[in-house]
Amino acid sequence: MHYTSWDRSDRTKPVLLAEDGPEQLGVFSENSAEVDGHFWRTEVSDLGASATLADGSIYRLAGRPGRDKRLEASLNGRTFTFINENSGDWIIDDVDDEKVGQFTARNSGVRKAILEFEHDAEGLTTAEIAGLSWFTGVILDANTQGKAWVWIITLVLASIVALVALFVL
């Protein structure tokens, strides 16, 4: 598999696809997922994200997804690092600093959250591919939400200044 992407036609239950589909790797909701026929309990907070798999394995993303430029991921003891190279471009390195994959927020990167793998994801299980892909979506969503708040506050302040200028001057 060269990459994963998301089908977000149902916003409450995005579907993780192998490449552009039709093969589905998993279906995610706010607090759970079904990946490769197995239940996952998922949680996202300001300090990271975690998924507890049916067999008790834990996948964890440590750091502030909307702010940090470097996040550490542990997939049941297997370590990966998400590194923001510049603005919206990210890479994923393994413990040996070998590039595993990359993704971007540019173009339709946030909507599809495409995670491209090096060497066709060789050496990664379906669960690990799904975990890294889910963390990619968490990071992109957190960055989008942070930028949305900046725009909202800017527009509110600009509106107040415009109203003051209109009625006072």
Across the structure, where does each feature detected by a protein language model lie?
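C-terminal single-pass membrane-anchor helix
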Residues: 134-169
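Cationic, beta-structured binding surfaces that engage anionic biopolymers and membranes
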Residues: 1-132, 137-140
